[in-house]
């Protein structure tokens, strides 16, 4: 991914995870998915995805061998871009605000 001042819609979303044992496993699970790119730094791991990223807590619990939920996601993540939706069983990042609004049933049209 290149940084710059391009004003066109990128159709990308992403999050920065702490490079800890838990963050590493989460990054590895996400990096195995189609359309997901990992960029590693000494203290953090960027997870960038095309259109949408789904952090499924059951999938991550299985990979970690211990419970994973929204509080742990919040603990290991810092910055993000895209629209974030937290559910009981997953966190979803959407590249498009319209897609996120449709997913949660929010009407973006002015009345």
Curated annotation (Swiss-Prot):
A GO molecular function assigned to this protein is:
monooxygenase activity
UniProt xrefs under Pfam families: MmoB_DmpM (PF02406)
InterPro entries from the UniProt entry: MOase_MmoB_DmpM (IPR003454), mOase_MmoB_DmpM_sf (IPR036889)
Source superkingdom: Bacteria
Functional summary from the UniProt entry = Effector component of the propane 2-monooxygenase multicomponent enzyme system which is involved in the degradation of propane via the O2-dependent hydroxylation of propane.
Q: Which family does it belong to?
A: Belongs to the TmoD/XamoD family.
Please identify the protein, giving its name as recorded.
Propane 2-monooxygenase, effector component
Originating species: Gordonia sp. (strain TY-5)
The top of its lineage is:
Bacteria, Bacillati, Actinomycetota, Actinomycetes, Mycobacteriales
Underlying gene: prmD
């Amino acid at each position: 991914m290149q940084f710059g001042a391009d004003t066109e819609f990128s159709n990308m979303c992403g999050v920065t995870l702490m490079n800890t044992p838990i963050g590493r496993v989460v990054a590895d699970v996400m990096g195995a998915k189609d359309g997901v790119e990992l960029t590693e730094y000494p203290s953090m791991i960027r997870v960038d995805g095309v259109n949408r990223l789904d952090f499924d807590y059951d999938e991550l619990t299985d990979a970690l061998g211990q419970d994973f939920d929204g509080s742990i996601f919040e603990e290991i993540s810092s910055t993000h871009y895209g629209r974030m939706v937290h559910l009981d069983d997953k966190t979803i990042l959407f590249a498009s605000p319209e897609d996120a609004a449709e997913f949660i049933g929010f009407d973006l049209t002015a009345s």
